[in-house]
């Protein structure tokens, strides 16, 4: 018998080899939404996975971001299985997220029609009604590969082949269709009733509920410019044969990593030069606003873009939004009483816009400097006056929000959205989430420059994400230009820095430990890459150190 300690301290005994599913069903009335996953010794655990040792047990319900990942993973497997059943010659590839939706590209010669997509959706809803079981098999590596061969690409099989020979792998089965998707799934299709399929571009959109509101299906909001940025990155990475982890590993093994680094960095330089050309052709331009989510590389982007602007004869002048914070005593507060420095109201908008108007009128302006120690704005004698061809460059969280700069006419400003839209995936079904890549960047940077351990970064990440959802993502469609800061090789470089930090997160850290173990698992598939040849102006240097722009970071 195994002894399990529940979250309330109760000790229960279960037979070795039993699963968490009966216990989850027994405790379901204590949760506001369905339980979709267990936490077994603080690690993610499928409800159908056999238990082999004593440990602690907790449960994750669907109505949060962690539970919604299980929901979406199950939904995706249903889409894969339904498509295989109805249209065996169709091959879907999971591409990228668009709000609370996933875009899957149809890579087959026989393209899905709108009627085909309706048929697949109806088939999936019948799965829900039947509560079609999502079976879980724990198989030795060789057996798992044999089973997966029928439904896996070369990239998927390459990942399976890479794990140690004595590994026991988890393969899922839905209506006889095998799948190897990273992470737990719901026990049956009845857990995921809310979704819709929509024809989109060269494939299909799978739309699903937002985190925290699992019973409401929001309308799909198209973001064509963002999707175009994703598709451009994915097509480029495929063109240079480095769009999956397996291909990156092969490049590293063959000794071609330095070339991939050079090519990726050259792409950034080319893109920034193109943006500078657009800015130079915008003859009435007075203001460039740069915004994006955490750890997108906004500061390095602003610095490198300023250099390219100077090449074109412009005079970029940086203004820090931090210097326009209200004095701390006047700052807005959150519901818990703490200061809210992320909301737009934390900025002295009246003073900021007054200074913008005066600067654009050619006046000399005394510039403030915010003292974070005292929580007050100070004036230290710094004055600013724009010259001919001067362009203000402002980087900040609210740059895309029109309420930040209402005093500046639209013809005088350009908004740039910056984010790490990674095209890298493990295979056609297991993508690398952009939020995970940014979290790894932030964790490494916090350790390198802010003396924060990984536990601290992981515990505050949900607050960071909440701010992004509130202050950045709603405005990204208003951007005039999107710049993708991802680097095709960075996953392998971040591995070297991130793994020791993640291993140091103690089990007592709760969900931070759970996230650390999940990130360690995905990092285990990529081979490490040394960083000596990464140039000192690389956006990645903003996070790993050695940046020529260190004074601006």
Regions found by a protein language model. Give the residues of each.
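Ubiquitin-like/PB1-type beta-grasp interaction modules and other compact soluble beta-rich domains
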Residues: 1-76, 80-100, 109-110, 122-123
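Auxiliary tRNA-acceptor-end handling modules of aminoacyl-tRNA synthetases
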Residues: 49, 56-68, 91-270, 275, ...
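Conserved NTP phosphate-binding and transfer environment spanning the P-loop NTPase/kinase superfamily
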Residues: 283, 405-553
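Hydrophobic anchor at the beta1->P-loop junction of P-loop NTPases
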Residues: 288-290
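Conserved lysine of the Walker
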Residues: 298
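Hydrophobic positions on the alpha1 helix immediately C-terminal to the Walker A/P-loop
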Residues: 301, 305
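Conserved nucleotide-sensing/catalytic segment adjacent to the nucleotide-binding pocket
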Residues: 317, 326, 330-373
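Glycine-rich phosphate-binding loop used to anchor ATP phosphates in small-molecule kinases
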Residues: 353-411, 457-475
């Amino acid at each position: 018998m195994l002894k399990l300690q529940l979250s309330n301290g109760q000790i229960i005994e279960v037979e070795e080899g039993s699963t968490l599913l009966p216990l989850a069903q027994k405790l379901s009335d204590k949760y506001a939404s369905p339980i979709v996953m267990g936490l077994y010794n603080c690690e993610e655990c499928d409800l159908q996975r056999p238990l082999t040792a004593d440990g602690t047990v907790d449960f994750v319900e669907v109505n949060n971001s962690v539970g919604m990942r299980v929901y979406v993973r199950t939904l995706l497997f249903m889409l894969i299985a339904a498509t295989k059943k109805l249209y065996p010659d169709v091959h879907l590839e999971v591409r990228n997220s668009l709000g609370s939706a996933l875009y899957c590209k149809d890579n087959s010669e026989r393209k899905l029609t709108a009627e085909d997509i309706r048929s697949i959706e109806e088939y999936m809803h019948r799965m829900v009604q039947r509560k079609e079981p999502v079976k879980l098999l724990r198989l030795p590596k060789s057996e798992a590969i044999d089973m997966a061969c029928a439904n896996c690409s070369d990239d998927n099989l390459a990942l399976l082949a890479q794990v140690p020979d004595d590994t026991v792998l988890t393969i899922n089965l839905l209506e006889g269709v095998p799948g190897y998707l990273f992470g737990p799934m719901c026990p049956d299709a009845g857990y995921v009733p809310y979704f819709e399929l929509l024809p989109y571009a060269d494939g299909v959109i799978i739309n699903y509920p937002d985190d925290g509101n699992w019973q409401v299906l929001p309308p799909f909001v198209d973001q064509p410019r963002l999707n175009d940025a994703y598709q451009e990155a994915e097509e480029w990475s495929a063109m240079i044969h480095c769009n999956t982890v397996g291909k990156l590993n092969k490049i590293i093994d063959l000794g071609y990593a330095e070339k991939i680094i050079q090519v990726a960095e050259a792409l950034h330089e080319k893109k920034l030069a193109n943006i500078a050309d657009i800015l130079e052709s915008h003859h009435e331009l007075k203001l460039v606003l740069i915004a994006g989510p955490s750890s997108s590389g906004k500061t390095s982007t602003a610095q490198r873009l300023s250099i390219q602007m100077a090449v074109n004869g412009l005079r970029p002048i940086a203004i820090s939004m931090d210097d326009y914070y209200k004095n701390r005593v006047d700052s807005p507060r959150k519901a818990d009483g703490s200061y809210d420095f992320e909301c737009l109201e934390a900025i002295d908008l009246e003073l900021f816009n007054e200074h913008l108007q005066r600067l654009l009128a050619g006046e000399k302006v005394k510039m403030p400097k915010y003292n974070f120690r005292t929580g007050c704005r100070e004036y230290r004698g710094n004055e600013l006056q724009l010259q001919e061809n001067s362009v203000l460059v402002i980087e900040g969280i609210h740059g895309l929000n029109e309420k930040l700069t209402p005093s500046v006419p639209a013809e005088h400003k350009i908004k740039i959205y910056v984010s790490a839209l990674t095209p890298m995936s493990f295979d056609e079904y297991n993508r690398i989430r952009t939020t995970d890549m940014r979290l790894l960047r932030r964790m490494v940077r916090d350790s390198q420059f802010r003396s924060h351990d990984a536990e601290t970064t992981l515990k505050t990440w949900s607050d960071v994400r909440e701010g992004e959802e509130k202050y950045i993502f709603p405005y990204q469609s208003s951007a005039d230009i999107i710049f993708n800061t991802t680097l095709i090789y960075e996953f392998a470089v971040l591995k070297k820095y991130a793994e020791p930090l993640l291993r140091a997160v103690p089990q007592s850290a709760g969900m931070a430990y759970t996230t650390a173990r999940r990130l360690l698992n995905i990092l285990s598939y990529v081979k490490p890459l040394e960083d000596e040849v990464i140039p000192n102006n690389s956006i990645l240097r903003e996070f790993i150190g050695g940046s020529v722009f260190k004074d601006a970071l």
